[in-house]
Amino acid sequence: MNQDVRVFPDSIYLSCSKKKASLRIDRVDGCLSLSNSLDLSKTPDYNNVQLYGFIRLKIYKYVVLVTSCDLHAAILGNNIYRARKFAIFPITRTLPFSTGLLNIKDEEELHYISLLNKHLSKGQILFSPTLDLTCSLQRLRVLTQSFELTSKYNYRFFWNKYAFHELIELTNKDLGFQEWIQPMIQGNIAITNSFLKTYNLRLCVITRHSPDYAGTRYFTRGVNAQGSAANFNEIEQIIMIESPITLEEQMVLSFTQIRGSIPMFWAEVNDLHYRPLLSLQPLDYSETVFGKHFQELANDYGDNLVVVNLLDQKGREAPLRSGFEKLCKRNKNPPLSYVYYDYHKQGSRNLPLFLAEIQSLLIEGKYYAEHGSKTTAMQTNFVRTNCMDCLDRTNVIQTSIAQFILNMQLHDIGVLSSSESLEEYDSFLQDFRLIWANTGDYISDLYTGTPALKGDVTRHGTRTIFGAFKDLLNCFRRYILNNFFDGMLQDSYDLGLGVFRPYDSLSIPDLPLRFHWTRFVAPGIFLFTTIILTIQELFGNPSLFCRLLYSIPMVNAGIYLYFHRRQYVNWPRLVLPTYAKGGWFSFRNHFRNITLKVFRFLRSGSFKKSV
């Protein structure tokens, strides 16, 4: 936050005392260049800002600045800031720089600006001037200065990479642009300081949310054509043991886990049902992107990937579980270590059995460790966990794995003796559980709009009545948000992350979305007649005529709402979900599914689906 902005009639300059050259933005064509001829005698129009990037909408190109931030945390001497306020300014000579947004008359452009503001205000955007937050500690240590710029950043978690794509391309020609690129993450950093025996321990959990297929719960499921999984997160647990003598002797241990949606073509289609229709494409359609997804994971994390599947063995999740299991066993590049645990059947009481099953893989894979400036161990096995949403069940399992690793780390470095266990220290264990529960809540809020379910298991290690009641309320909130509000939020993701680019769009969506008053007639009739009938039954003795007078329109309105329920879902307007534009529910697709069922019946005498 030490950058200044100076506005001139034909250009805009960003300067910083710590940078060799100023960044010049041409107000005619929006081109970026480096300049050493800035007149610093001119008072800055804006000071103490941080460049977020540049985004072009339908008419104008804009510079996005962080104008206010808070100190969020400090890790290994590096300050981490959270962006609190943003400012969006048009890059053009036809509008005043500071008040340009007030002079924009185009309704569609204003709607895009509103969506961009919504995108910037969602979640937590974190950055550090001295630490690349896109990389885990292990990745940072293995990088060398000989790598090019594009190899330094971990683009999987570079949240504002679309806003910086122009500068990144220019860096390939002139490395001077590199110092103006500030990678930011959408994520959370939770830190707690604890005292264990005679040791001062600092526990930190860093969450990195991937921008590659980001969005809301029902509009981003499965995997996209590029092999990027929905709701993909990297969670790094760092434990720092302070030396009483010198900082150089500090021990730092970290363990990284990942989670993401099942990398297959599948969806749950919003239709106002509490559990929407689950649609799964044939496995052959998903095999290519499945392999691409895990190949990219192998490139980032190595070939030793452990896949933990928490889907139900029976019920509506069974076809998805079976298909995922088959693809895992088919995949040979890289080969996957597959572990299955039916959480809803086994529950949290059998977690020790699950940990015993993967114990050898965790011990073999180790963790990253450094003592002072020397690296003493490297993590070689990485666990990828998923359930249906990669939220509630996944939180419980990843917390259990993290606790197992923490126990192992503290034993290895001598903080705990071989006969001791972390479970014996209630105060430290409570801090550990709280920090992981908050991490789960953050990821869940990004994806669903509510804290995670089963948070009481993460916090207390067992189910509680109060926790079950909170889950009930959060389920209701999820239903409302996911059905009636997530469409616009998904639009904000697609616009801010470059999935939809207004200047390059051939079809202009109907923005902003307006509902004709006739759409509210049926819900109004249903609600009004239901209230009247309820009042009459509770406080009066209505005649048959009165009952029929209100019951008939109520039933008709209810039937209309049932058969037109998808029209009342808040759908995205910029980019339709894959299943909505890919013919998943076309007559041809239904005919194919019916044909497959008939074929199964003729072959095995059963309509039961075998995935």
UniProtKB/Swiss-Prot annotation:
Domain SAC, chain residue ranges per copy: 51-351
PROSITE patterns registered for this protein in UniProt: SAC (PS50275)
GO biological process: phosphatidylinositol dephosphorylation; sphingosine biosynthetic process
GO molecular function, a single term: phosphatidylinositol-4-phosphate phosphatase activity
Domain of life, source organism: Eukaryota
Record-linked InterPro entries: SAC_dom
Gene Ontology CC, one term: endoplasmic reticulum
Family from the record: To yeast RSD1 and S.pombe SpBC19F5.03.
PANTHER family: PHOSPHATIDYLINOSITIDE PHOSPHATASE SAC1, PHOSPHATIDYLINOSITOL-3-PHOSPHATASE SAC1
Protein name (Swiss-Prot/TrEMBL): Uncharacterized protein C3C7.01c
Species of provenance: Schizosaccharomyces pombe (strain 972 / ATCC 24843)
